[in-house]
Amino acid sequence: MIKNNCAVGIVAALLLWSQAVFSIPNSQVDLDISAESIARIALYYEDRPLNGKEFDFPLPINGISQKFENTSSFFHLIGNVDNAEIVFLENQFVLPQVFGGDTHINLDGSFIHQGVETDSTKKLRLPVLKNISQATTSNGVKVKFISEFLAGNYTKGKYANTFTLIVMPIL
């Protein structure tokens, strides 16, 4: 009987002790940590970031071709991915007359990368630089627009439109 009482006492003490252990708050915490970096690309022109959404690109008359024509300086892509594609959203480049007429100027648009001229309505793959200090003529791109006809064929007036350049990171 004494052995049974002793065993019951030990079991009761163990149960009370185990209950006390379970009532102590756990001092271990699991932290689930995660981070996500999204692709970022900035468009630079003449070694400066293009802030804002508009960029003026006048088309003067070229003294040799006698067409409305302009070729930009170099654009560069700066960001945290290796490559990106650029393309203009529009399939046609048309400058309507702003005031007093129905005349318009059709333009051909092109990209010039590493001396090769390509259609600007087709995607062009370009390197994305980590810093503007890496910019060279071989990793930049120029944009060129030229009118379909000689400037003298168009009615006198102002012609204007906005075209959208899309920059898409390649992940």
Name each model-derived stretch:
Residues I105-H113:
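Short, surface-exposed beta-strand/strand-loop-strand elements in extracellular ectodomains
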Residues M1-V8:
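Bacterial N-terminal signal peptides that target proteins for export
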Residues I112-T136:
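Extended, solvent-exposed segments with strong compositional bias
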Residues F22-D102, S133, T137-L171:
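N-terminal small/polar-rich segments of proteins
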